[in-house]
Amino acid sequence: MKIKRAIIAPVVVALLAMGTGGWFLQRGVGQERNIYANARMFEDVLRRLSDNFVDAKQPAELYQMALEGMLENLGDPHTSVMVARDYDRLRLQTQGEYGGIGIQIDRKHGWITVISPLPGTPGMRAGLQAGDQIIEVNGETTKDWDTDMAVSKLRGPKGSVVRIKVARGGVDQPIPFEITREEIHIQAVPSTYMMDGNVGYVEMVTFSESSTDELRRSIEQLRAQGARGAILDLRRNPGGLLDQGVSVADLFLSRGQTVVETKGRVAEQNQRAVARTADQFPGFPLVVLVGPQSASAAEIVAGALQDHDRALVVGRTTYGKGSVQTLYPLQADNWLKVTTARWYTPVGRSIQKPYGIDAPHPVEGDAPAAEPAALEQEEKPEYRTASGRTVLGGGGIHPDLVTTPDTLTQPEREFLQDLQKHGSAYTDARLSFAVSYLRTTPGIQPGFAVTTAMADAFYHALVQAGVSVDRDKYDRAQRWVMRDLGYYITYSKWGEQAAQQRANADDPEVHMAAALLRGATTPQSLFTLAARFAARRAPQPQP
């Protein structure tokens, strides 16, 4: 099957298709009579409202209200009418370069919500977080905006400023941000490095046109350095181009194996994508890390490798974005975007979560503890992989080893809640401190230690910047502060890969994956080790 190139924009897939007329001709005569009867009743209601409603309404306004109500009642946030300028924006999104702040967004509960700030972008540096609801852009409320409207407002010329306010869980007041737009270029694989024990680490943060080539080069580089297995980290990957998701999975699957299927009411929407080449890294053990920010194309890759027993999936349940949208042309250069199909993994699991069920967003700094997938609270349908292993359905990709977030200490939570009230003021002060520290410490090395003296100096820098924090809370949250400082000083000096490598040193999910890979020689031995690991963590029956 040939899958046309598509882009998630943001986190929605647009498979461009030409619509055809003759809708009435495709229906039976009886249905046509009912349609005309309903149309006459609709026109009668509209005319009487236009003539008699206490507040004057123009017919065009009433038609628009009816159209919006019809689409709203479908219960599908991705089905909508796009005017010509919206369609032009959608085409712009396929070009891969634009002036913006670098965040992936979706519409949830009537508000534009941050799914993921992209690494190295103004949005990430400003401190935007997954789960933030953008409630204002340049003084305009975003209530009931669709994603296309939000994209048009958030994007703009390089160097221009956008002012936003976000609502964040645990913070009483909206948080203001003032962010300077930059030209956004997304590097698909920002981090590739060797860990101890001949284990490689690769992080992929998007599925762009270069994703497959970047990942192939990264795996080849790691193997040349002696890697006997690798971690593929998709935890911060909100998706991207569908065809790149298919080709990334193709790197590790055998020719002819199913990657993903689409199923809809119309026959042409029922398609199957298969691997076109042989496994390019046969026998190479692979652990895929996923989480609530892993979406769409990232879920296709994780699901395909899991179903074919090619990779062990570790982490938390993914976002669950698995629907296909098709564009149909309307009059006056308008377009109808319709959800026409859903994605299914090779064993038949639907990737799409039911609307209204949101993936939980972990609190920054939470540490996971492993639990077997069977211990998840709600019951989910079971499926069998190619070798007979049990995997769970119900929307999203459920890992083979599920991690549950541990909590920050109460003082750390209180400190973070206080910081969030200051919006980007904290991140601005942190960046200034990092720049100043690097200027006065020219011989610094990547493995530097953050000392208590540095933490004390940072506290005074916050006070001078107008970020008022309680000193006692600050001292009791010093573990978090020191990790945060270490990450951002590293980021400022050596870039994303060095910062990610430092963060991974304290990441229990990465440590868990690496420990499993060190004992594995083949994908099959990796599954055996994981099963033993899960059995040790399972609760024992009570006598």
Label the model's feature ranges.
Residues W23-N38, S50-V54, Q58-P59, T113-A130, ...:
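Cleft-lining beta-strand/loop regions that shape enzyme active-site pockets
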Residues M1-K4:
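Short, Lys/Arg-rich N-terminal segment immediately upstream of the first membrane anchor
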Residues F53-I115, V161-S191, V260, N504-A514, ...:
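Extended, small/polar residue-biased N-terminal targeting/export presequences
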Residues V45, A66, I103, I164, ...:
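Residue-level signature of catalytic and energy-coupling elements of molecular machines
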Residues A297, D309, R316, G320-P381:
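Polar, glycine-rich mid-to-C-terminal structural blocks
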Residues N38-V45, L62-M70, D86, G110, ...:
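Stable alpha-helical elements in mature extracytoplasmic
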Residues I8-W23:
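Hydrophobic membrane-insertion alpha-helices, especially the h-region
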Residues S350-I351, Y355-P543:
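Conserved functional hotspot residues or short segments at active or partner-binding sites
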